């Protein structure tokens, strides 16, 4: 292996070229910083656009149902997580640029400037000494030639006045030549000193320092680029995991199940109307006038008689009764109990199916899995649903209101519910329920899809009401909120909060706020546990 060449040994006379190399290295490092900053901005914009797209409610699969809807919702959720991965990579890239590259440029600026300034001074001193030595030598040689000329002129003069004059001229020329000689010697000595500094002492050290400076810059550039690739390599494996989750969601699409559920939810259950029959004209006396071609087997009763189809004849006219409309139970509204009162199970009044004024009287429906002696609701079983805050009931003096849903709105259960009365229905979390009646008391009527056609009552606070999804969300990004209740969780990505604490909100997501506390710890927390201030 050949010996390594050095700036001080092989570029001793190329200081200006070395300075240009160092300056070009600085320019390259600045370009690298700008390039990676631009890459970071693109990554951040892509990540934010991806997350914004996934959060856009206009693309929510509300018009679809069943496994296809769930699969597309899974796709949106996993794509949002992929966007979060790119945002995390963007943040690391920004940190690398600001702390790593830009920090190095600022730190090395003074050191680089000092080395170049010392080298330029050393070069200038050498050139000045060389110039002075050259001028002193020329002056010395000129004076020596005058001394020789004066000595030669003296040798040609005869004794007398001219000889005396020539001798004085020679003496003057000799003194000037001696002075020039001394100046020349001093200039040579000064040049030797500067040559020692330039060729053997100061300049070699400067060149070695500049070489080490370049070595460090190149090594750091290599490390920076390697760090970018290393961080970038962390994204694809995580993306593959999210893509696998998307594939599982797509594979779970069940066409027959979706279509059968649609049929079950949409069908009215009514019988097809009977085939149209010819009805002969009834005379004023109540007797039918029958043509000879009419069906002779048609039974006609007079006045108070009955038709075979079940309709009654009054005053000679046939009246066919219409299908009986479904009768819904009337639920009376009752003021809910105060927060400090232990929540009791609803009570059912006496049922009397033979009277028109019969109704079931119920209290406010129970909260999901209530805990006696406490006002804290349990955590929901679904990850995307925020927990309920401690129960706070207020008196509602409004009159009872009953709304019948003729279209059969479909809602999804948030929690398991076990019926405690005969007229109630039981269901599991995520079950689909077809609502046939709403009531302000909180008890609705409906049927569990896919289990039975039985209609019963159930508490409305155990289900997700799709009518609330149309409410516009208030932009709370950047605002402060005050914690109303303590919230403790072991779930990764959720924030423990304490009553009275002040939090900063970054964005809202389906009943959750994402933000940070005063210790700059960022995570999500239930929006119904805080009050925006």
From Swiss-Prot:
The molecule here is called SH3 and F-BAR domain-containing protein DDB_G0271676
Q: Cellular component per GO? A: cytoplasm; perinuclear region of cytoplasm; vesicle
- Supply the source organism's classification: Eukaryota, Amoebozoa, Evosea, Eumycetozoa, Dictyostelia
The entry lists its GO molecular-function terms as: microtubule binding
UniProt biased composition (Low complexity): 318-327, 340-360, 372-385, 392-405
Biased composition regions of type Basic and acidic residues, renumbered to the chain: 126-155, 162-184
Which part of the chain is the F-BAR domain? 5-258
UniProt organism field: Dictyostelium discoideum (Social amoeba)
**Which Gene3D superfamilies does the annotation name?**
Arfaptin homology (AH) domain/BAR domain (1.20.1270.60), SH3 Domains (2.30.30.40)
Residues covered by region (Disordered):
126-184, 301-405
Q: Which residues form a coiled coil?
A: 76-186
User: What InterPro entries has UniProt attached to this entry?
Assistant: AH/BAR_dom_sf (IPR027267), F_BAR (IPR031160), FCH_dom (IPR001060), SH3-like_dom_sf (IPR036028), SH3_domain (IPR001452)
GO terms under biological process: actin filament polymerization; chemotaxis to cAMP; vesicle organization
